Design a protein with these regions (language model features):
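Short functional hotspots at interaction and active-site rims
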Residues: 1-147
C-alpha cells in the first residue's frame, strides 16, 4: 500500500494460482477485514486473476473474494513498476544483502523482521504521476482525435 507505507513479504515454495489466492484471502480477511473494496495493482502474471479464487476455494468463498477485489494491471513500462522495483531494491539491500539463506523458514523470518521494521517507519511512496503528465510524457501512446 504505497501511500500508507504498508508492505508484506512472504516467500513460498511455489508461485501457483492457489498460493496467490490464499495470500489474497489472507489480505482480505486479516489485513483489510472491514474494507468493502480492495484495489490491487498487479503485474500480468497468469496467477494474478480472479479465476485463481475459483480454482482454490468453494464457489461461495471464491465469489465473496472476487467481489472484494478490484484488479488493475501494470503496463510493461510504467511508474507502478518503478514503485515495485524500489521496494525490491530496499528488500535486497536492507534484508537479503549478498548472503545465502538456506531455507524457506529462515527466509520468511528475515522477511518478517524487514517488513515489520519498514512498516513501522511508514516508508511510503507518494506517486505524483497524473493523467496530464502522462499525456505529455507518453504522448506517443495517446491518439489525436479530431472531429
Amino acid at each position: 500500500e504505497p501511500l500508507a507505507g504498508f508492505r508484506h513479504a512472504k516467500a513460498l515454495e511455489h508461485r501457483t494460482k492457489i498460493d496467490w489466492a490464499k495470500q489474497m484471502k489472507w489480505l482480505a480477511d486479516e489485513v483489510y477485514p472491514n474494507a468493502e473494496k480492495i484495489i490491487m495493482v498487479c503485474d500480468n502474471l497468469n496467477t494474478h486473476d480472479k479465476s485463481s479464487f475459483y480454482e482454490t476455494f468453494p464457489p461461495a468463498e471464491a465469489l465473496r473474494l472476487a467481489k472484494r477485489f478490484e484488479f488493475h494491471y501494470t503496463p510493461k513500462h510504467g511508474s507502478w513498476l518503478d514503485i515495485a522495483e524500489i521496494e525490491l531494491s530496499a528488500l535486497s539491500k536492507q534484508c537479503l544483502g549478498k548472503r545465502r539463506i538456506d531455507n524457506l523458514e529462515d527466509l520468511n523470518s528475515e522477511l518478517e523482521k524487514w517488513h515489520t521494521d519498514r512498516n513501522a517507519m511508514q516508508k511510503g511512496v507518494d506517486w505524483q504521476f497524473t493523467t496530464d503528465d502522462a499525456r505529455i510524457k507518453l504522448k506517443h501512446l495517446y491518439p489525436i482525435v479530431t472531429f
